[in-house]
């Protein structure tokens, strides 16, 4: 399943918020290419002191988001430990998705 990286849409939301992605074209469904819940960069979603751990990723993020969104025209994912579990305590996390719309 090769998806050209160029046509992927990329969305990001900080922990505690929800992200809604959609495929407005008729008959198109969401196909998730990448999903990260955690922290891999310090400068994203800045917070007081809880951003130094950049080796933090929920291992289940891609499967969770695919289960929620696969084939739908729109879906909402909450960036929270309730959804993904907590991959690293005391770290302010974010959710980053790359997706495209496939017919």
Curated annotation (Swiss-Prot):
Disulfide bonds join 14-45, 23-101, 56-88, 69-75. Activity is stable up to 60 degrees Celsius, then decreases and is lost at 100 degrees Celsius. Residues 13-102 form the SUEL-type lectin domain. Not glycosylated. Pfam families: SUEL_Lectin. Coiled coil: none annotated. Keywords: Disulfide bond, Hemagglutinin, Lectin. The keyword DNA repair does not apply. Activity is stable between pH 4 and 7 but decreases at basic pH. GO terms for molecular function: carbohydrate binding. Homodimer; disulfide-linked. Rhamnose-binding lectin. Also binds alpha-D-melibiose, alpha-D-lactose, beta-D-lactose, methyl-alpha-D-galactopyranoside, methyl-beta-D--galactopyranoside and D-galactose but not D-arabinose, L-fucose, D-glucose, D-mannose, D-maltose, D-sucrose, N-acetyl-D-galactosamine, N-acetyl-D-glucosamine, N-acetyl-D-mannosamine-D-xylose or by glycoproteins orosomucoid, thyroglobulin, ovomucoid and porcine stomach mucin. Shows cation-independent hemagglutinating activity against rabbit and human erythrocytes. This is L-rhamnose-binding lectin ELEL-1. It comes from Echinometra lucunter.
